Amino acid sequence: MKIRSVGAVVAAMMLAGAATACGSSSSAGGDGPQIAIVSKGFQHEFWQAVKKGAEQEADKEGASITFEGPASESDVEDQIDMLTNAITRKPDAIGFAALDSKAAAPLLEQAKSEDIPVIAFDSGVDSDIPLTTAATDNKAAAAEAAKHMADLIGGKGKVALVVHDQTSLSGIDRRDGFIDWMKQNAPGIQLLPVQYGGGDQAKSADITKSIIQANPDIKGIYGSNEGSAIGVVKGVQESGKKGITVVGFDSGQAQIDAINSGVEAGAITQNPIKIGEEVVKAAMQAIDGKGDDLPKTIDTGFYWYDKSNIDDPKIQAVLYH
């Protein structure tokens, strides 16, 4: 374990402040191993749930964590700055959810050269440097969303996708998993060109309204993460168009409310608390010199939920508010 000087701690605090100026951050824990977690976001309820899981596990393990993420899930440069600052603080391990699967590669090389183990989460990277990736099987989850969409609209009609990005592996997999299932299993469904809203609710709502205006006969719209799905719901509501089936991804209070009210048909929920827990568990294993024993991926699971099962205790346990 690394020994820190007073000067290093002061420098770390200053750097953390600089990162906070363009996003949000928090810290928790005591004097144990230091784990710096750089997320894809901070404000969405999903990321707050990941943070909660990481904090809970850090308390169990006697570790100390910092958790930060950019204000928007399109702020790749801000996230790179945060990762740079995290490496400068020389933590015992880093948890990283990449907004761009390629942009962080040089920094991951730097972390490796400084013997800082990296644990990827939510989105992997185009690198073998992370010892493991704790994440949902996003392709399988998106395929499940596609299956439910096809069933809900009777296997025919136009369907649109509003995806959070085309640079992170989660964005790519949630797009491709949905499209591939539809192409293989639903020949009667016409997929419209994919639109990208950056996970931003307002932008995704505007995109949705444009889709509806250009395709008044549209049957369904899929939103690939919390911000995208809520944006789709708002866009459908603001358009005044009835009869559009909305399928989302993630949960959060706004999506839960939309499903309970019938505006959204259903969604895939991940297990963000478990993701946070697994990041810290894996980091601690790496700090203890057992990183080579970690599996390549840690599948944290997913569930379909709708009005019929939303009150099931198993579903309630993985919904975040």
Q: Can you annotate each of these PLM segments?
A:
Residues 1-34, 59, 109-116, 321:
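Short, low-complexity disordered leader/linker segments with a strong preference
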Residues 79, 134-159, 173, 201-205, ...:
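Hydrophobic alpha-helical segments within soluble ligand-binding/sensing domains
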